[in-house]
Amino acid sequence: MWKDLFVKKKKYAPLPSEQARHEVPEGVMTKCPQCKKIMYTKELIKNLRVCLSCGYHHPMPARERIASLLDDGSFREYDADMISVNPLGFPGYIEKLEEDRRKSGLNEAVVTGEGALDGHPLVIAVMDSSFRMGSMGSVVGEKITRAVERAREQQMPFLIFTASGGARMQEGVLSLMQMAKTSAALKRFSNDGGLFISVMTHPTTGGVSASFASLGDYNFAEPGALIGFAGRRVIEQTVREELPDDFQTAEFLLKHGQLDAVIHRHELKETLAVVLDLHQKGGEEGWWRN
């Protein structure tokens, strides 16, 4: 027994297997699609999901976007429990919606509500491309329309951040009619003098780009955002011409007069606060464009 107490200890420790050494928990690291650099996801989030190496603007979840812009504790969400059904009986659609709800933590591809930005009250809508690629179905269109109507009733500015692949094919014509419905609501809002600010993020395409995304009194975009209706390849085949390398980027649209400004994400809050300052009315008159 005494001999066992003084057994010489081994001078090595077991090494992890080759597979274990290369396994990193999912979500800890993020690879930039532009510069291919790998960075800690926590550091990327701290930097508002702007690449620390090349400045690429990664997609930003809707709730992160709201938290980064609005004053602490000011946000009150609208229509949080509104969810899509399957009006056309499209095979597998309900299952895909449930999967996206589980992965994104959202009930739909847009979050709407009211809050304050640097003390300025407003109504806000933020689309999230992690839910059905931000596609616009009947619920997305309804939530945006209701948000615009509330902004009109309460005489507050309306701010939207778009990120979408276009109309949702699983809902057919019901998704296409949202283009007209949202645009009509914005027309009524504009006729009453309402201030509408649209910020297009990557990507803003299809029926969203062809409707409410482009109707702002101010049309802004983030750097490098893909903005357009049809895809590049479809357009090239139609016009039988090779398109410029920067075609359908935010910078291309700015150069051709379709945007008012391309704004870095780090400067967005300050810029929006300045715009709201310019359009504020005193007393009880509210916040109006005119």
From Swiss-Prot:
<feature type="zinc finger region" description="C4-type">
    <location>
        <begin position="32"/>
        <end position="54"/>
    </location>
</feature>
<comment type="subunit">
    <text>Acetyl-CoA carboxylase is a heterohexamer composed of biotin carboxyl carrier protein (AccB), biotin carboxylase (AccC) and two subunits each of ACCase subunit alpha (AccA) and ACCase subunit beta (AccD).</text>
</comment>
<keyword id="KW-0963">Cytoplasm</keyword>
<comment type="pathway">
    <text>Lipid metabolism; malonyl-CoA biosynthesis; malonyl-CoA from acetyl-CoA: step 1/1.</text>
</comment>
<dbReference type="InterPro" id="IPR000438">
    <property type="entry name" value="Acetyl_CoA_COase_Trfase_b_su"/>
</dbReference>
<keyword id="KW-0275">Fatty acid biosynthesis</keyword>
<dbReference type="InterPro" id="IPR029045">
    <property type="entry name" value="ClpP/crotonase-like_dom_sf"/>
</dbReference>
<dbReference type="GO" id="GO:0008270">
    <property type="term" value="F:zinc ion binding"/>
</dbReference>
<dbReference type="InterPro" id="IPR041010">
    <property type="entry name" value="Znf-ACC"/>
</dbReference>
<dbReference type="InterPro" id="IPR034733">
    <property type="entry name" value="AcCoA_carboxyl_beta"/>
</dbReference>
<dbReference type="GO" id="GO:0016743">
    <property type="term" value="F:carboxyl- or carbamoyltransferase activity"/>
</dbReference>
<dbReference type="GO" id="GO:0009317">
    <property type="term" value="C:acetyl-CoA carboxylase complex"/>
</dbReference>
<keyword id="KW-0444">Lipid biosynthesis</keyword>
<keyword id="KW-0443">Lipid metabolism</keyword>
<keyword id="KW-0067">ATP-binding</keyword>
<feature type="binding site">
    <location>
        <position position="35"/>
    </location>
    <ligand>
        <name>Zn(2+)</name>
    </ligand>
</feature>
<feature type="binding site">
    <location>
        <position position="32"/>
    </location>
    <ligand>
        <name>Zn(2+)</name>
    </ligand>
</feature>
<keyword id="KW-0479">Metal-binding</keyword>
<protein>
    <recommendedName>
        <fullName>Acetyl-coenzyme A carboxylase carboxyl transferase subunit beta</fullName>
        <ecNumber>2.1.3.15</ecNumber>
    </recommendedName>
</protein>
<dbReference type="Pfam" id="PF17848">
    <property type="entry name" value="Zn_ribbon_ACC"/>
</dbReference>
<keyword id="KW-0276">Fatty acid metabolism</keyword>
<dbReference type="GO" id="GO:0006633">
    <property type="term" value="P:fatty acid biosynthetic process"/>
</dbReference>
<dbReference type="InterPro" id="IPR011762">
    <property type="entry name" value="COA_CT_N"/>
</dbReference>
<comment type="similarity">
    <text>Belongs to the AccD/PCCB family.</text>
</comment>
<feature type="domain" description="CoA carboxyltransferase N-terminal">
    <location>
        <begin position="28"/>
        <end position="290"/>
    </location>
</feature>
<dbReference type="GO" id="GO:2001295">
    <property type="term" value="P:malonyl-CoA biosynthetic process"/>
</dbReference>
<dbReference type="GO" id="GO:0003989">
    <property type="term" value="F:acetyl-CoA carboxylase activity"/>
</dbReference>
<keyword id="KW-0862">Zinc</keyword>
<keyword id="KW-0547">Nucleotide-binding</keyword>
<feature type="binding site">
    <location>
        <position position="54"/>
    </location>
    <ligand>
        <name>Zn(2+)</name>
    </ligand>
</feature>
<comment type="function">
    <text>Component of the acetyl coenzyme A carboxylase (ACC) complex. Biotin carboxylase (BC) catalyzes the carboxylation of biotin on its carrier protein (BCCP) and then the CO(2) group is transferred by the transcarboxylase to acetyl-CoA to form malonyl-CoA.</text>
</comment>
<dbReference type="Pfam" id="PF01039">
    <property type="entry name" value="Carboxyl_trans"/>
</dbReference>
<dbReference type="GO" id="GO:0005524">
    <property type="term" value="F:ATP binding"/>
</dbReference>
<feature type="binding site">
    <location>
        <position position="51"/>
    </location>
    <ligand>
        <name>Zn(2+)</name>
    </ligand>
</feature>
<keyword id="KW-0808">Transferase</keyword>
<keyword id="KW-0863">Zinc-finger</keyword>
